[in-house]
């Protein structure tokens, strides 16, 4: 199937993948008076007395904003906010289909960090959470941090944290397959953008001790010249042995390679230098750092990619609907590391021992157990940490 042509036909035909649904009858004068004036004044007055009542008297409790500036849309790059709308609508469809979360796309005509932060912060009272989407690094870090400081609802950059959660879930199960412990492995990450940074932080929280990040200039280590503030911060908590050199040097002896970088970056020769039963997560899209067959031929035991046409797809849709479902259910103020760890472990646990194998380390996106498993784990973690409001 030619997905490009068929998708374009679909979008011309439906003219938008979302619409508003009405949840109350408006088929009589009495019904109209309850849904709108004069009756609607009473819930307004209740919310005026206590703004938290907006969660009980409006759809705020179940509504998320999907926010972009169009600067890093898929592999298309900076295409602008209007051009990003089909992706944002698609994201909203996934929220509803896989998490029963109502989501609204907000495409902002500005690349200025403060413009975006101010716009979203001023609208935050209408939503139970905000999903930041396809915003270029390093601005995405600053936007998320500033927004979370100003808002008392979850601000979640899915390109960072959703990727990290699914990566960790896959790694938990891949390590079971090869019989290794997370605290014993050497792990190399290629790519120090939004996803790479978030994956690094979550894997460190999960127990990885020997983790080396690589960017275009090679291994990141303390004292390396030209590091931006984010990379300098990561240099202080990664690469404990201070390894230097390019990817081809530092990958020697590694148990795990995680790629969130560029096509073809990992060669068969590099895989051959890795430890026995190596794990490869090659997630550059649409072309991975190395093709699965090539990685396996070079000795890799478990290979995952971001593509649906290969086994072991690392796909954010496995986690973000459930994470928001859980956060919204308990009115969490933010999404913490413990909530993300809980989501990853819940996702990994859905693949039982009998099904677990080299080509089956993650559940399928259409597995109906995912929403409840992930959301309940996230809600429980939020309550345990004191982040929940109900």
Model-predicted segments: where are they?
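N-terminal ligand-binding/catalytic initiation module
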Residues: 1-155, 375, 381, 385, ...
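Short, ordered loop/turn segments at secondary-structure junctions
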Residues: 69-71, 79, 108-109, 134-137, ...
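Adenosine-phosphate binding glycine-rich loop
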Residues: 158, 282-390
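Rossmann-like adenosine-cofactor binding region
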Residues: 232-301, 307-309
């Amino acid at each position: 199937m030619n997905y490009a042509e068929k998708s374009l036909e679909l979008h011309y035909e439906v003219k938008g993948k979302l619409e508003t649904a009405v949840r109350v009858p408006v088929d009589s004068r009495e019904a109209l008076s309850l849904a709108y004036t004069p009756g609607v004044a009473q819930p307004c007055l209740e919310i005026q007395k206590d703004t938290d009542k907006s969660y009980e008297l409006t759809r705020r409790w179940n509504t998320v904003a999907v926010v972009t500036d169009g600067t890093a849309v898929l592999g298309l790059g900076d295409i602008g906010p209007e051009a990003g709308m089909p992706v944002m609508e698609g994201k909203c469809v996934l929220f509803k289909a896989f998490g029963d979360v109502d989501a609204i796309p907000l495409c902002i005509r500005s690349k200025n960090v403060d413009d975006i932060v101010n716009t979203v912060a001023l609208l935050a009272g209408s939503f139970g959470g905000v999903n930041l989407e396809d915003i270029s690094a390093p601005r995405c870090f600053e936007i998320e941090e500033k927004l979370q400081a100003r808002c008392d609802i979850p601000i979640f950059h899915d390109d960072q944290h959703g990727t990290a959660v699914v990566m960790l879930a896959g790694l938990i199960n891949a390590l079971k397959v090869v019989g290794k412990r997370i605290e014993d492995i050497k792990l190399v990450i290629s790519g120090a953008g939004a996803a790479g940074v978030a994956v690094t932080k979550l894997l460190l929280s999960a127990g990885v001790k020997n983790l080396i990040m690589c960017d275009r200039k090679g291994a990141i280590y303390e004292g390396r010249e030209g590091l931006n503030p984010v990379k300098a911060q990561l240099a202080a908590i990664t690469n404990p042995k201070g390894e230097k050199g390019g990817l081809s040097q530092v990958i020697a002896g590694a148990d795990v390679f995680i790629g969130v970088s560029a096509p073809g970056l990992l060669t068969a020769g590099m895989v051959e230098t890795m430890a026995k039963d190596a794990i490869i997560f090659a997630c550059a899209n649409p072309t991975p750092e190395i093709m699965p067959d090539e990685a396996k031929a070079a000795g890799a035991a478990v290979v995952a990619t971001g593509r649906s046409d290969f086994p072991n797809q690392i796909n954010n849709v496995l986690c973000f609907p459930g994470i928001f479902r859980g956060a919204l259910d308990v009115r969490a103020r933010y999404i913490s590391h413990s909530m993300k760890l809980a989501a990853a472990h819940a996702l990994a646990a859905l693949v039982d021992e009998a099904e677990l194998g080299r080509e089956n380390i993650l559940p399928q996106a259409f597995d109906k157990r995912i929403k409840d498993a992930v959301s309940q784990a996230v809600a429980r973690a939020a309550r345990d940490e004191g982040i929940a409001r109900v």
